[in-house]
Amino acid sequence: MAYISLEHVVKRYKMGEVTITAVDDITFDIDKGEFVIIVGPSGAGKTTVLNILGGMDACDEGTILVDGKEISKCNSRQLTTYRRYDIGFVFQFYNLIQNLTALENVELAAQICKNPLPAEEVLRHVGLGERLNNFPAQLSGGEQQRVAI
């Protein structure tokens, strides 16, 4: 069984009289540990698919399973819990709090986790042990992204 499974997923956006189909009957599976790249032209629905998988939007039709949990049937409150505890999402523009250190940014995020790991240990694990007390402006883009992850 796939870790992530999308079956016949459809997403439409309605704006007044106009309906735009952003995702039209897509089906694919991703196994646990598999590395996947989603590519396509502008407007193909890549961001919409990721927003649905990340629990930030819902599909209009179809079934989405993540680790056996059918997120396509989740209500708003359940999606919030899913986003908070079950999935990680790092945006292209990850907004770290600029007046907090790398360590403080991770400690802040850990406050909403069920079983957070020690922030200092996590940062050391991703190669930022010497940068704990640096502010985002003092970190490279890649280092900032590791803090966000």
Place the predicted regions along the sequence by residue.
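ABC family nucleotide-binding domain
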Residues: 2-149
